[in-house]
Amino acid sequence: AFVIAAADIDLAAGKPQAAALRLRALLDVNPGNHPLTMAYANALLRNGRPKDAQRVLVEHSRRKPDDPQVWYELAETHGLAGSIIDVHRARAEYFILNGALDLAERQLGYALDLARSDFHTTASVQARIADIREMREEIKL
């Protein structure tokens, strides 16, 4: 908690690089720590490194796939990194975790529209849409 507070002070003082370095050092000895990882990604964003923050949060989403806050932050980070298809995919995961299946499916529809020329992404998005429809059917039972 102290390191995160110190990093917050660095950020408030306009020293995002110092905050990122401080948090990275502690993550090296506490890999996968949720609060440290989220704070580190934020420090990277504030340091103008959205692609690095994106990489950190994508990896973290694999460790914490059921955490809506991770998906929310990841969607925002994808946007800042210019990965618009991934914005919609991350938003969909956020909505799924919050029980908003219609909104999730809509987000995946947007992703599908953007991914038409990418077979792998299209197939993956279509599979997730099928998952949502299956979830909806299970709810009706």
Which positions does each model-derived feature cover?
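Alpha-helical linker/edge segments of TPR/alpha-solenoid repeat scaffolds
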Residues: P50, L80-A90, A130-L141
